[in-house]
Each structure stands twice: as C-alpha cells, then as structure tokens.
C-alpha cells in the first residue's frame, strides 16, 4: 500500500507538482499553535501609527528616556516623535529593563527572541527565552477580572489574560497591567487602565499572524491598532541564544539577574565606554 510520502515523491518524479506547490498543501490544525516561534515581521512597537496622546500620556512619554530608536534632536522625517527620542549616552537612559526589571507585556511579546507556545487543559502558555518569563492565556471560559476583583488582584507585569476561539482565530484580552513597564523599547507608556486585545491566526504550517489593539483612554485618545506581526516557526534544534545555535535544543535561560547586572550587564549597557546596545 502506498503511503502519503510515497505518493508525494511519485508526484514529484512524474512532474505532477512542484515542491513549493505541495508544501503549500501541507495540512495543519489552525487551532494548534504549539511550537517554538519567533517574530520575523512587524514593528518593534504596536505600530508606527501612534494615536494622538492625552496631555497625561505626553507627560509620561517625555519622562521615559529610551536608548533605542533615533536620537533626540534628529529630524522627524514623518515619524512620530516617540521614535526619535533616544539618549546618546546609555547611562542617561532610564529604561526599567536596564535595572533587570521585567519587560512586561506587550514589550516582551514584541521582542524578536524565541517564544514557545504550549497548549494545556484550558490554557495556552507562552514561555519566553528572554527573561525565561511565562504568560498564562486562559481559555477555560473565565472572563478577565473587572471591578473589585481586578482591584484586589492588583497590577501585574504581564497582566491577567483570558479569551476564546472565534472561528480559527484565538482572541485574547489582557487587563491589570503594571504601568511601570514600557509598551516597547521606545518608551511609550501605558496606564493601569490599559486593555490589550490579541488576535492569533495560524495561516500556514510555519506561520502565525498576530493583530493587536491597545485601548488606554487615559494616555491615548483613540485605540492603537497594530500592524500585522508574523511569527515564523523555529526548529527546536535551531533555536538561537545570542547566536548560539542548537547548544541547548530549545528555549534557554535569558535572565538578567541583578547580581550579574552590577558586573557585566551594567557595564555593557550603562557605561558610556561599553558601547553596548540596550535591548
């Protein structure tokens, strides 16, 4: 009896289809997001189209001093001013990450480091290489906390996330975010009133598309809608940690520990002579 692989091989030999055509026909479960993925397309922020900010939001933006983006004082060239504010000397920045504080959400998700998606009963887990952080995306029918429940839980670096499938798109909402963590590497702020919607759609065996919308009426006058973020599957043996391939065969530990920060991490990122590039 012919196996499927035999049929595919025979089809190629007889010229019935190209390898690329057959690859496009590979079956996949659109509701299975498991695997190791890495953002390969999309802005490092929500998007380049930043909504008009409230006075309170503008003040918070000005207080944040990033080391990434174009330098403060350079021509905007059509960019939002938030992307042209980087300090020229890393030690003059005040990025919380430089003190080994968590990236928080959505910043960690926007970082182009590998992340593993793991399906469990009633949850989707996201295990990040950077920080070795874990997000729990609840899918057991619960709603995101609100009112007194949210107040009692208090803010969290990665918030409180719940959602459900809408067709073959996984829709998640996150609330209760700690406002000390920046939205992105550029220092855009978020308030504790922020709600972020994520919409994950698996478009192929090796791709997931993510669309996000940030709602924060305290800092932004209208919702901030993302561009399309594309996640590409990474083979476990090809997962890289700062250029090291296959040494650990999967997600590895990328933790910034305060005791290390004082010695090496701090010298690289905060010492002007270190010539380091902050994450």
Each predicted region: which residue ranges?
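PEST-like low-complexity, intrinsically disordered acidic/proline/serine-rich tracts
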Residues: 23-279
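Bacterial N-terminal signal peptides
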Residues: 8-19
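Positively charged n-region of N-terminal signal peptides that target proteins for export
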Residues: 1-5
């Amino acid at each position: 009896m012919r196996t499927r692989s035999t049929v595919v091989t025979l089809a190629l030999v007889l010229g019935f289809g190209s390898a690329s055509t057959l690859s496009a026909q590979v079956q996949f479960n659109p509701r299975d997001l498991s695997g190791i993925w890495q953002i390969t397309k999309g802005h490092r922020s929500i998007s380049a189209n930043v909504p008009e900010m409230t006075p309170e939001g503008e003040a918070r933006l000005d207080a944040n001093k990033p080391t990434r983006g174009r330098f403060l004082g350079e021509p905007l060239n059509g960019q939002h001013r938030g992307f042209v504010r980087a300090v020229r000397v890393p030690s003059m920045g005040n990025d919380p990450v430089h003190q080994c504080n968590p990236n928080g959400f959505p910043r960690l998700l926007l970082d182009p480091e590998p992340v593993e998606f793991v399906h469990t009963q009633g949850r989707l887990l996201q295990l990040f290489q950077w920080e070795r952080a874990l997000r729990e995306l609840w899918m057991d029918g619960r709603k995101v906390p609100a009112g007194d429940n949210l107040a009692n839980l208090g803010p969290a670096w990665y918030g409180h996330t719940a959602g459900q499938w809408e067709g073959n798109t996984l829709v998640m909402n996150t609330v209760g975010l700690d406002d000390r963590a920046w939205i992105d590497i550029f220092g855009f702020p978020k308030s504790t009133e922020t709600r972020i919607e994520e919409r994950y759609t698996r478009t192929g065996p090796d791709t997931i598309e993510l669309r996000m919308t940030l709602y924060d009426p305290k800092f932004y006058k209208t919702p901030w809608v993302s561009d399309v973020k594309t996640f590409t599957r990474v083979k476990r043996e090809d997962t890289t940690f700062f250029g090291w391939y296959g040494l650990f065969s999967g997600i590895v530990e990328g933790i910034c520990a305060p005791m290390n920060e004082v010695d090496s991490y701090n010298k690289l990122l905060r010492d002007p002579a270190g010539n380091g590039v902050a994450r």
